[in-house]
Design a protein with these regions (language model features):
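Nucleotide 5′-phosphate-binding alpha/beta core
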Residues: 1-90, 95-113, 117-121
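Active-site glycine/GP-rich loop and adjacent strand/helix microenvironment
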Residues: 2-15, 19-32, 36, 152-249
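Surface-exposed charge patches
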Residues: 40, 117, 147, 169, ...
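Conserved small/polar residues in nucleotide/adenosyl-binding loops
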Residues: 91, 249-251
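Acidic/glycine-enriched edge-of-secondary-structure segments
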Residues: 96-110, 146-156, 173-180
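Short glycine-enriched loops at secondary-structure junctions
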Residues: 108, 135-137, 184-185
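Conserved ATP-dependent adenylate/AMP-binding module captured primarily in the ANL superfamily
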Residues: 112-129, 163-176
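Conserved AMP-binding loop of ANL adenylate-forming enzymes
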Residues: 120-156
Length: 251
């Protein structure tokens, strides 16, 4: 397992909690001053930003629900001015009205750093070749993984999803070492690779899979069919896409 930002990733627990509190206080003040819904709900609970003095005070804050994100669509929960928003992503809306998330330039920088950490944890570095087979577009997967791969300095192949046999040819010819896609697509790639009889031509070492639930049985199938270590990356439109956390099998 490697690290992209060791000074952050190995931070002392006390220093980490101090940083978490500073950022929580800053964020609460920000939304209280800039988002009417949060200000109204905090006032209703009798909570002011200055009441957040320690991490456990998080429990004093009102919940935000998925329905809130739909009800205040598209921009009413944005704490940043629209002129500072440089990108929009959105959920698929399969279980209700879609939600949108606005990203500032700073958000995108932070997101790229977070995803770079996940790629490093899966053994990636500036010598790696990362094939991004998540879909690109409003879905966060493609551009999220792409940003992290470029941030770490890897050669990035933006194949997106589909056109599977071409993907496999590129994977072989360009020497992809890391694969980023959904676990179901990884399984399909593995099946197709074995049907084509080209598994021994792969240079893959690891896969970073997310955007849908998968089981340990699926993990084992993917690892066997592609000859890699398979890692589960977490993310959600409301925070960032992939890059929030990565599961590592280290015990």
């Amino acid at each position: 397992m490697g690290m992209y930002q060791p000074e952050i990733e190995t931070m002392d627990r006390n220093e980490l909690e101090k940083l978490q509190l500073e950022r929580l206080q800053k964020q609460v003040k920000n939304v209280y001053e800039n988002v009417p819904m949060y200000r109204e709900r905090m006032d209703k609970k009798g909570v002011k930003p200055e009441d957040i003095k320690e991490l456990k005070d998080l429990a004093k804050l009102p919940f935000t629900t998925k329905q809130d994100l739909r009800d205040y669509y598209p921009f009413e929960l944005f704490a940043a001015d629209k002129k500072d928003i440089v990108r929009i992503h959105a959920s698929s809306g399969t279980t209700g009205r879609q939600i949108v998330a606005g990203y500032t330039r700073n958000d995108l920088d932070m997101w790229a750093d977070c995803m770079a950490r996940q790629i490093a944890a899966a053994g990636g570095d500036e010598n790696s070749v990362v094939q991004v087979s998540y879909g690109y577009g409003l879905f966060t997967g493609g551009l999220g993984a792409h940003g992290g791969s470029e941030r770490i300095g890897a050669m990035t192949i933006p194949t997106s999803s589909g056109n599977t046999e071409r993907q496999i040819r590129l994977m072989i010819e360009l020497g992809a070492t890391h694969l980023c896609c959904t676990p179901s697509y990884a399984m399909y790639l593995g099946e197709t690779i074995n049907e084509m009889g080209v598994k021994d031509q792969l240079s893959l070492k690891a896969g970073i899979f997310g955007a849908e639930p998968w089981t340990e049985d699926m993990r084992h199938q993917i690892e066997q069919s592609l000859g890699i270590k398979a890692y589960d990356v977490y993310g959600l439109t409301e925070i960032t896409g992939p890059g929030v956390s990565l599961s590592l099998i280290h015990i």
